[in-house]
Amino acid sequence: MKVFTGSAEAALNKAAEAVLSLVRTKPDCVLALSASSQLDGVYAALRESGADFSRCTVFLAEEFVNVEDASLTRRAKLEAAFLSQAGISRVHCPDAAGCEGYEAEIASAGGIDLALLAIGRNGRIAFDEPLAAFDSTTHVTKLTESAQQEECAAFGANPPSQGVTVGIHTLMRCRRALLVALGSERAEAVHKAVAGRTHISVPASLMQLHLNAELFTDEAAAAEL
């Protein structure tokens, strides 16, 4: 796994440049995108780039299950952060009742060219929590307390308890994977992901086995490397 370390701004811009490079060479590319708040700066850079994303196809990497307020969904967050302003209309979202169908949609689109993900404090990627099976495809999962604390602040005292996510195997099949980790609270997870043994207890560490994975961190997140 290649690692880029710099300021938070530099790391986010570098990740955005990787996405833009693909979009410019393959305008009809297929992207798997997480709605993690860690990626807000990447999406801001993409919005400001002036690039044409209209031919891209997007598959959301994760979504909450049984959320009544549509404005609190991962799709709504990603629409506000990037999709609507980028003019992307071909957007697919995982559904708890259609996991196999989601994999079929990805295959029908030609597979994922690039996945943009964040590393959680517990080493998760998307909603693939610790101990997610290496051969997992899109599936429903219980959200850990760590995930709820990081990604469910808008829900107040009643965060969703389940999510649906692309699986580790799904991500291993993507042609390129970009991971982002910022802040000292992710330093331990980054160390385990990059320098630790590959194990399902730290899903991000499994990306060491990916042939084209890159990690973008700031100095704080890379402090234990």
Where do the protein language model's features map onto the residues?
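Glycine-rich N-terminal segment of FAD-binding domains in flavoprotein oxidoreductases
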Residues: 25-49
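Short acidic/glycine-rich loop or secondary-structure boundary segments that cap or lie
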Residues: 67-68, 123-129, 133-136, 188, ...
